[in-house]
């Protein structure tokens, strides 16, 4: 299985370094696309200040984001996988944090946000954010800081976090109403 992961990672990372335009676009995705996704959710929160269902959706996305990153921190304590560029496998186009590679925090966070919107029946925006999450995950492999399996692992963590929050934090419960009105 490692050989397949390695081959897929090398294939995607092998596309880097051939066009500065493409490299710059992908580097932007790898570094900044997650912030754009967060900004979109926050803008919906403020735009629909008096519409509680949209605010609830934004709250679920935020809680899913936090849960996914917390789960990644725990997994990171248990699974120590060197980043592919640190292992000499890929060439990195960006600097990265000095933590372990698996699972991808960017992937977990972006898929948590996109999946939360999907589970809250905000399908149109969710589809756009799933496309953004896939682009973000692929860009992290392209720039050489993650294996493909790191991104897939992060996507599973994000999806699971969003599912758990969506199922346990319903729109009609008292806690949800209080939190939405509080902020």
Where are these regions (language model features)?
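Membrane-water interface at transmembrane helix exits
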Residues: 13, 43-47, 72-80, 118, ...
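N-terminal transmembrane-helix/juxtamembrane module of multi-pass inner/ER membrane proteins
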Residues: 1-37, 72-99, 176, 180-183
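Alpha-helical transmembrane segments
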Residues: 29-36, 57, 61, 107, ...
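Hydrophobic core of alpha-helical transmembrane segments in multi-pass integral membrane proteins
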Residues: 35-45, 66, 70
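Membrane-embedded catalytic cores of phosphoryl/pyrophosphoryl-handling enzymes
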Residues: 94-183
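Short, hydrophobic transmembrane alpha-helix segments
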Residues: 22-25, 46-51
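Membrane-interface loops
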Residues: 53-119, 177
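Membrane-helix interface segments
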Residues: 19-21, 52-56, 121-128
